[in-house]
C-alpha cells in the first residue's frame, strides 16, 4: 500500500503496532502494519513482517521484581502495582486541558473536543496494597533541590508532561530551555522548591542515527550509550527511562569496532529481530549508569517505565481505530507487548545485581511495571482527537487516529502515582504502617 506523510501525525517521533489477539511463532513479521508507523515518519512505503521470536503469554497479574525497597529502610515487602483492577473514581483528575499549558496539542483530548468524559474517572487499585492519589506537595518535597530527568521517546515526554501538569497544580514550572525541534529537549525550573525538570529525546537510549530521506532504516550502536543525555548523568538525581516503540522500526545494529551484528527488516543483512537488541541496549544503558553513578557517590534513583501497549483495532486512518470508552475488565498481556515488558523487567533485575556488586548503596533502580494496567486502558488514547474537533464536518473518508499516546489528563497520570509511591516507600514513609 502506498503511503504518504502527514504533518499532523502522532507518530512523527513514535512508532506503534496493531495486531491480532493471538500471535503465533514467526508471524509477527508477517502480520503487523508497519505502514502505520512509517506513514507518519517518512514519505516512503513498504510492507513489513516482524516475527514473534519469543512467543508466550503473560497475564496482567504478572509480578515485577519484589525488591523495591532497600533493606536499610526496614521494609521487607513492596507493592505489586501490576496486579490490580481499574475502579471508578468520581474525584476526577487534578488538572484539565485548560489549566495546564505543557500538554502537547495532540494529547489535549478535552480541548480538542472529545465528548465522553468517563475515561477520566478511573483509578488503579492494586490487589494487595494501597496506591494513594497523587499528592503534588509530597512529590515536590521529595524532589526538592533535585534534578529529575525523563529520557526516551515521545511516551517519555507524555509521562513527563503528565507529571508537570500535576506538580503545576501547586507550583507552576518555568520553561528555561527548548531546542526548538518539536520540543524534543526541554528544561524547566520550579523556583518554590528549587527543582529542575528535563526531557531528553533519545528513542534508543544508546547511540543511534535516526532514519532519514537517504536511509529508510535506523542505525544503532549497541555498545555505546547516547551521550546527549548520559553526559549529564552526574547532575541528575531522579532518572526515568521510557523507550521501546522505536525498536520496532527497521534498523541495522552495530556492536564494537563498527561490527554489524544484523538487522531488523532491511535488505542484505541477517535478520535478528529486536527483542535481544532491546535487551542489549538496556544492558549498555544500565551498565553506564552504574559505572558513572558509582563514581560520584550521590544518592540517585533510576526507573524504567515498561512497554506501553498500543490499541489499534483497525487501520490507523479509519473511523473507530481506537474507539473504546471504558476500560477492559480483563485482558491478557501477550506476544510482543509481553516480551518487551519481560525484557525491560529482566534488565532492571540484572542492573540491581550490578549495583550490589559495585557496592553503591546510594543508587536505587526499579521498573515501573505499567504494561498490564496500560493494556486495559484502550479508552485512554486520543484516537481521532489528536486533531481538534475531527468530526465537525461529519466523518470523513480518512480519520487519523493516535492509539499509542495517552490523553492528558488520563491513564498515564497513574504512572506518576506509582512513581511517587515508590519514592515514598524508599524514603521510609510507610515504615511501620500497614500498606
Regions found by a protein language model. Give the residues of each.
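A compositional signature for long Ser/Thr(±Pro)-rich, low-complexity
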Residues: 2-435
Amino acid at each position: 500500500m502506498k503511503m504518504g506523510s502527514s504533518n499532523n501525525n502522532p507518530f512523527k517521533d513514535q512508532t506503534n503496532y496493531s495486531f491480532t489477539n493471538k500471535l503465533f511463532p514467526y508471524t509477527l513479521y508477517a502480520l503487523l502494519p508497519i505502514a502505520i508507523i512509517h506513514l507518519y515518519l517518512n514519505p516512503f512505503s513498504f510492507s513489513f513482517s516482524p516475527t514473534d521470536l519469543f512467543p508466550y503469554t503473560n497475564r496482567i497479574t504478572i509480578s515485577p521484581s519484589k525488591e523495591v525497597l532497600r533493606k536499610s529502610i526496614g521494609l521487607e515487602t513492596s507493592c505489586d502495582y501490576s496486579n490490580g483492577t481499574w475502579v471508578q473514581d468520581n474525584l476526577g483528575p487534578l488538572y484539565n486541558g485548560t489549566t495546564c499549558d505543557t500538554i502537547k496539542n495532540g494529547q489535549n483530548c478535552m480541548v480538542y473536543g472529545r465528548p465522553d468524559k468517563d475515561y477520566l474517572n478511573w483509578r488503579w487499585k492494586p490487589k494487595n496494597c494501597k496506591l494513594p492519589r497523587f499528592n503534588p506537595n509530597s512529590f515536590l518535597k521529595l524532589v526538592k533541590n533535585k534534578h529529575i530527568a525523563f529520557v526516551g521517546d515521545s511516551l517519555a515526554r507524555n509521562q513527563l508532561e503528565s507529571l508537570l501538569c500535576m506538580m503545576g497544580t501547586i507550583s507552576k514550572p518555568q520553561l528555561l530551555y527548548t531546542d526548538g525541534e518539536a520540543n524534543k529537549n526541554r528544561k524547566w525550573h520550579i523556583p518554590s522548591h528549587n527543582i529542575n525538570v528535563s526531557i531528553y529525546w533519545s528513542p534508543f537510549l544508546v547511540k543511534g542515527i535516526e532514519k532519514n530521506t537517504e536511509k529508510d532504516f535506523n542505525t544503532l550502536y549497541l555498545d555505546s550509550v547516547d551521550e546527549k543525555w548520559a553526559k549529564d548523568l552526574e547532575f541528575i538525581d531522579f532518572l526515568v527511562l521510557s523507550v521501546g516503540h522505536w525498536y520496532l522500526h527497521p534498523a541495522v545494529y552495530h556492536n564494537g569496532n563498527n561490527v554489524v551484528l544484523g538487522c531488523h527488516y532491511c535488505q542484505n543483512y541477517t535478520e535478528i529481530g529486536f527483542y535481544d537488541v532491546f535487551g542489549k541496549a538496556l544492558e549498555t544503558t544500565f551498565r553506564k549508569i552504574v559505572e558513572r553513578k558509582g563514581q560520584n557517590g550521590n544518592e540517585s534513583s533510576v526507573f524504567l517505565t515498561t512497554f506501553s501497549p498500543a490499541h489499534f483495532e483497525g487501520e490507523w486512518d479509519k473511523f473507530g481505530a481506537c474507539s473504546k470508552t471504558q476500560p477492559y475488565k480483563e485482558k491478557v498481556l501477550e506476544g510482543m507487548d509481553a516480551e518487551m515488558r519481560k525484557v525491560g523487567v529482566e534488565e532492571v533485575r540484572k542492573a540491581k545485581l550490578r549495583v550490589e556488586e559495585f557496592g553503591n548503596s546510594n543508587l536505587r533502580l526499579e521498573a515501573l511495571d505499567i504494561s498490564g494496567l496500560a493494556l486495559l486502558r484502550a479508552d485512554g488514547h486520543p484516537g481521532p482527537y489528536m486533531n481538534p474537533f475531527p468530526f465537525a464536518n461529519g466523518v470523513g473518508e480518512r480519520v487519523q487516529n493516535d492509539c499509542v499516546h495517552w490523553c492528558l489528563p488520563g491513564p498515564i497520570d497513574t504512572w506518576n502515582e506509582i512513581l511517587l509511591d515508590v519514592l515514598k516507600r524508599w524514603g521510609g514513609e510507610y515504615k511501620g504502617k500497614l500498606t
